[in-house]
Structures are given as structure tokens and as C-alpha cells.
Design a protein with these regions (language model features):
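Acidic, mature catalytic/reactive cores of soluble proteins
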Residues: 1-674
Length: 674
């Protein structure tokens, strides 16, 4: 695994401030920042704690301002950008190297002839961040000063201090910071350094990326303590930031635990792929580690019968798992979870995690629907999705294909049967089976129900009301899956087969013979929609394809000609009047381009599998995935982005680490090796 940069990247402000790192803790918390150390997003910080795992994410420790005293010289290792654009200090100039050690960001700072190494990681399962310094080389001891800047806000927000007084108290090995009476305390601890407490607001940090996103770009942070010590050559110090009062303080012990955890993940992957692991490129190992960052715990409470489940606040009855859709801002979404599950868990040798996720979401099924998302603020789950539930069937099918777990299928079968029943007779949002043609209809005015779900105020950018092609391809596959499960369990299967046969017979309505590919949506309020979008690729990539071989080839070729890029498929063909080549600006501008030409990385997986089905050339199919190896070095380091601009140079945008992009690259790579 070779993500590493020297001075040509680290010493240039533009490049070192645009490449971002991420570490996570398995319960929704994370730390994130730039190589330079400058804050450019409201989501940057050393401890963003999940106070209601996996949500309730709260910025607690923003950063450490690091200063080295050595040979009568003062070296400021931090980098800050202030209102007005001034960059001071410029610590990025001292970075000799940055690399990822697994997922652990590692810096080496050159201060004269001294070399100081820094690592940042989190404890799995705890809101605890470790910042560890090693003095690798020096001709005499250094003085190291660490100024702790804190906050206490939702990670989506931004704070102006307005005279906010936090309680800063000394504890045995550091300080305890309490932002308000009901706030969760932050402990800043080191058993090696002395701590001097302060209460000094730093005003007007400039968040350049937030400004580009049309959002508030100013923030204040509170300096609560300075830790200082004399560090000898060959010695180390660890600063621990935690919501726990007594975390492990030995940095070497904690670091070894983290390394062992990541090695275990790679062992799962390699054991599962013993037949081919020796031929895998190193960058796939980095993706396996990235895959784990999205898998988090979710505590489930079982609601009373016939009640819509609410976000769990009461006593836990089940310890479950879920998938965060993307860092830094997404929560767990039903659609993203089910699409991501095969690649993040099954493709990495972690079927037991897949089982937990499938069981977790079964408790949230309501009126035959999976939740669309769980809001960060802890309200009821939202159910405005037509496809998440159908992706649930596909995730279970792939899980069973790998595990042959009859017990889980038997457990979930009543839920699956209920889902089919609700869809046949009709559920929320006018989602129902049209008895006239056996196709699934979805939508009402003002709603967005498919994955192309951008909405600004009352403006639904891509309403797709009617019979979307990918929804009906998924519906057809769900019916065939249910028929197989029914036969396996000795239950009646004829009804599922009959509905599936009817869907198959009328799926031909999607074929647009005039252009040689499929309509995107049938029976919209204005007729059939002939717009070339990538959604039809799923009618080829899913196991049960309702298209003829000639139609499959037509779809793949059309997508390859007009939608394919190095990092995914465009959401709209460039020759369409609504095509948007640029993704940027304020929320309205961004959402207006989100599915109107913007490239989506996750779609490369379905394209590769569809191409493999049509052309039966695994070497060529795999070549479509190889540009992602370069992308691991360019945005969210060690991970894959959510979206990219539609025109060259296909600039990455959106989340720096997106679950379904990582998942689909892993899944598709596995498919090319079968």
C-alpha cells in the first residue's frame, strides 16, 4: 500500500490543503483533516464524536496547534487560514513526508536536523482519538507545545463564540472540558506532558471549501489548554482526546491495537480470496481497509406491533450494524446500505457483518418499505424511497449465494413476503403494482423516490414519477428471488413466478427501438421519458436480466459511448439540454447538477458487470476499474469519492469517502476474477 507524498505535494499549499485524510471508530465518530493541517471544512477535526451512535456527531477537539523549540529556533508546525485569506502559521512548509500507514495518517516534520513524526488514529468502538509524536532524529531534546482548540457543535454547523464560557477543569493527567451543563465532557489527557489551562477564543478561521459550497465560511474555536514537555530523541508522547474519563493512555499499546485490527481485516480478505489474493494489486488492500470505515454499530429497539419504528432512544434490545453512506456528512441510508453491503462485507470476507446488517434493517420495515435514511437529529426514520426495499432483496440474494444461510432466509422470509404483498396492493407515495402490465409505479407530485433524489425547496430536480427502469429491473429480480426462496423453504412459489412472468412479458415496453436503448421512465405525466441516463445499466447487471442479448448489448454500448468516464458513469448524457458539466456553487446550484450530468463513482460497478456479461472479457472489464487506483491518492486519501464533474478533468466532488463507490469497485473486481 503506497499512499505517500514528499515535499512536492506537502510543501505546496494548494495541493496539501486539498488532499484530505479520514480515520473512524466504528460507531459513527471520525477525525478528518488535510495534509497541510489547515481547516477547510466544518467537518474537519481531531474528534468528531458520535454521541448517539452512529449519529449525534459532534465536533469536540478541532485541532492541535503544534510548536517546536529546537536550537533556539521556533518551528510552528500548524497551518491556519484566517478571514481575509492570510495563511499563518505555514507549518505545511515543514512537512517532509505524509503517508497512510493502513488508514493511519502519518506526518514527518523536518525542523533543522530534527525529524518529528506524528500519527492520528481512533480506538475502535470508542469516541477516542490518539495523536502520537515520535522524535525520530535530533541532536538535542526539543520543546514540544500542543495548544488544544475545542468546540462543541453538530458537525454540520459552524460556531461564532459570542462569549461562550466553557468549564475547563484540571484532572489527574490533563484537562476536562464541559461545554454546557448537559454536554458530554471532553477529556484531553497525557501522562507525559504538563497541561496549562486557558480559555482563549481564536476568531475567524476561514473555511474555504464551505465558501465554495455556498455556506458559512467563518468559525471560532476555543483554546483550552497547552500541553508541553521536553522530548528526547528516540522518545514519544501521546495526547488522547476522549469522551471517556479513563481511556488507554499508552500510545504504543493503542497503536498496536489499531494495527492488529487492520491486519485482521486484511486477513479476512486474503483468506476469503486465497485462490487469487497473490495476484491482487496493493491498492485493493487499501480499499478493503476503507470499506470498514463505513460499517458502524446501530442500537435497535423493537417498537410495539403495528407502530412505525422510531429512532432508538429507549433501552436497547438488539445490537445491530449499519453502513454510513459517506464521510463526512451522510448518515445511514437504507438504499446506500443495501447497495453497499455486498461489496463492503461479502467481497471482503465478512459475511457475519452482512448478516447483522440485514437483521438490523428488518426491524425498521414499515408498510413494506425500508427507511430511506435515519436523520442525524434523531427523529423518525424517513421512508421516501421506492428502491431501497428492492435493493434489500438483492443484498439478501447475494448474501445467500455466498453463505447458503438457510436460517437467515427463514427468519426474514415473512418480512420479505409482506414487502411483496404491500407493493402488490399499494403502499406509501403511490407505490403500487400496475395490474395492466405488471410493472411497478411510484411517485406523487413533489416527491423524489429513486436514487436520483435531489430536491431544493419544492423543486424536485429529477422527479422520475412513473415506472423507472431500474426500479422495475429490481422488482423483477426480487420476485425471482422470492420464488427461489419459497421453493427452498417448501412454501408456495407459483404466485411470485406468475407476477415475475408478467413483469418480464411487459418489460419490453422499456425498449426504445428508435435509439437502440431503453426509456428511463415509462408512463410519466408527459409520456415515456427517452432521456439517456445510466439507470438502464441495472437491467443488464442484475442476475435476472429482463432484456434480450441484443438489447443488453445496446444498453452497454450506449452507456459506454455517452456516459462512461474514468471514474464512473455520467448521470445524464452530455448531448441532453439539461446536462450540467460543472458541479459547484450554493446548495441549489449543486443539487441542480447532482443528477444532471455529474459522474457517480458507484455506477462503475454495475457497468463493469454488465460489460462482462455482454462481452465476456474479464481483462477488459477490469481495466475500467483501474483508474480508481490513482484516485485513491487525489481527494479522500485511501478512499473513493462520491461524485465527479461530468467534463474533463473529471474533478472529484461531494463526499471524500463514499460507501457505495468503494463497495462497487470491490464487488466488480471480484466479479472479474470468477
Amino acid at each position: 500500500m503506497g499512499i505517500a507524498f514528499g515535499r512536492e505535494i506537502c510543501g505546496d499549499y494548494h495541493t496539501s490543503s486539498s488532499r484530505e485524510w479520514l480515520v473512524t471508530n466504528g460507531i459513527g465518530g471520525y477525525a478528518s483533516g488535510t495534509i497541510a493541517g489547515v481547516l477547510t471544512r466544518r467537518y474537519h477535526g481531531l474528534l468528531i464524536a458520535a454521541l448517539q451512535p452512529p449519529l449525534g456527531r459532534t465536533l469536540m477537539l478541532t485541532k492541535l496547534e503544534e510548536i517546536v523549540h529546537y536550537h533556539q529556533q521556533i518551528y510552528a508546525l500548524s497551518t491556519d487560514r484566517w478571514s481575509g485569506g492570510k495563511i499563518e502559521p505555514q507549518g505545511y512548509r515543514h512537512i517532509e513526508q505524509f503517508k497512510l500507514d493502513g488508514t493511519i495518517p502519518t506526518w514527518r516534520y523536518a525542523c533543522g536536523d530534527a525529524l518529528l513524526q506524528k500519527r492520528v488514529w481512533m480506538q475502535q468502538g470508542a469516541n477516542t482519538t490518539y495523536v502520537h509524536y515520535d522524535l525520530l532524529r535530533a541532536s538535542q531534546p526539543i520543546g514540544l507545545f500542543l495548544k488544544a482548540l475545542v468546540n462543541y457543535r453538530d458537525h454540520h454547523g459552524a460556531i461564532k463564540s459570542w462569549g461562550w464560557q466553557m468549564a475547563v477543569d484540571r484532572v489527574e493527567t490533563g484537562v476536562k472540558v464541559t461545554a454546557a451543563d448537559e454536554a458530554t465532557p471532553l477529556y484531553l489527557l497525557s501522562d507525559q506532558a504538563e497541561a496549562l489551562t486557558l480559555h482563549d477564543w481564536y476568531y475567524n478561521f476561514d473555511l474555504a471549501v464551505e465558501r465554495a459550497r455556498g455556506l458559512s465560511d467563518r468559525e471560532d474555536h476555543l483554546h483550552v489548554a497547552t500541553f508541553h514537555l521536553t522530548l528526547l530523541p528516540g522518545h514519544s508522547i501521546t495526547l488522547v482526546a476522549s469522551t471517556e474519563s479513563s481511556p488507554e493512555l499508552n500510545g504504543n499499546t493503542a497503536f498496536k491495537q489499531r494495527q492488529n485490527y487492520e491486519q485482521k481485516l486484511l486477513n479476512f480478505w486474503k483468506t476469503d480470496r486465497a485462490f487469487s489474493a497473490k495476484n491482487d494489486p496493493d491498492w485493493l488492500n487499501q480499499l478493503v481497509l476503507a470499506a470498514d470505515q463505513f460499517i458502524v454499530s446501530r442500537t435497535v429497539t423493537l417498537p410495539p406491533p403495528d407502530q412505525i419504528p422510531v429512532y432508538p432512544h429507549s433501552a436497547a434490545l438488539l445490537s445491530g450494524k449499519t453502513i454510513l453512506a459517506g464521510y463526512p456528512w451522510f448518515s445511514d441510508w437504507g438504499r446506500d446500505t443495501m447497495i453497499s453491503l455486498p461489496g463492503l462485507t461479502l467481497a471482503t470476507g465478512r459475511s457475519e457483518i452482512a448478516r447483522l446488517i440485514l437483521r438490523t434493517f428488518s426491524h425498521y420495515v414499515s408498510q413494506g418499505m425500508l427507511p430511506n435514511r435515519f436523520p442525524d437529529a434523531g427523529e423518525q426514520p424517513e421512508y421516501n424511497t421506492v428502491d431501497a426495499t428492492l435493493w434489500y432483496f438483492e443484498a439478501i440474494r447475494q448474501y445467500y449465494q455466498v453463505t447458503q444461510d438457510d436460517d437467515l432466509v427463514m427468519e426474514l422470509f415473512p418480512t420479505l413476503a409482506d414487502i411483496i404483498d404491500w407493493h402488490c396492493r399499494g403502499t406509501r407515495f403511490n407505490i403500487h403494482l400496475d395490474p395492466a402490465d405488471g410493472l411497478l409505479y411510484a411517485g406523487e407530485t413533489g416527491l423524489q423516490l429513486t436514487w436520483m433524489d435531489a430536491k431544493v425547496g419544492d423543486w424536485v430536480v429529477t422527479p422520475r414519477m412513473g415506472k423507472p427502469i431500474e426500479v422495475n429491473a429490481l422488482w423483477y429480480n426480487a420476485l425471482r428471488t422470492m420464488a427461489r426462496f419459497s421453493r427452498m423453504l417448501g412454501k408456495p412459489h407459483q404466485e411470485y413466478e406468475a407476477i415475475a412472468d408478467r413483469t418480464l412479458a411487459r418489460f419490453s415496453r422499456f425498449w426504445n427501438s428508435e435509439v437502440g436503448y431503453c426509456y428511463d421512465v415509462l408512463d410519466t405525466p408527459t409520456g415515456n421519458d427517452p432521456t439517456l441516463r445510466p439507470n438502464q445499466i441495472f437491467a443488464v447487471s442484475l442476475t435476472e436480466t429482463p432484456l434480450t442479448p441484443a438489447q443488453q448489448r445496446g444498453v452497454v454500448d450506449a452507456c459506454a459511448r455517452s456516459l462512461l468516464t474514468s471514474y464512473g458513469l455520467r448521470s445524464l448524457a452530455p448531448d441532453q439540454p439539461s446536462y450540467q458539466a460543472h458541479y459547484g456553487g450554493d446548495p441549489r446550484q449543486r443539487d441542480g447538477a447532482y443528477h444532471q450530468g455529474t459522474v457517480w463513482g458507484w455506477l462503475i460497478g454495475a457497468f463493469v458487470i454488465a460489460h462482462l456479461r455482454v462481452y465476456a472479457d474479464p481483462i477488459q472489464a477490469r481495466q475500467f476499474l483501474e483508474p480508481m487506483a490513482d484516485h485513491l491518492n487525489n481527494h479522500g486519501l485511501g478512499s473513493l469519492s462520491e461524485i465527479f464533474e461530468g467534463d474533463p478533468p473529471i474533478t472529484p466532488r461531494g463526499c471524500i469517502a463514499q460507501a457505495w463507490t468503494v463497495a462497487e469497485v470491490l464487488r466488480a473486481w471480484n466479479a472479474t476474477e470468477r
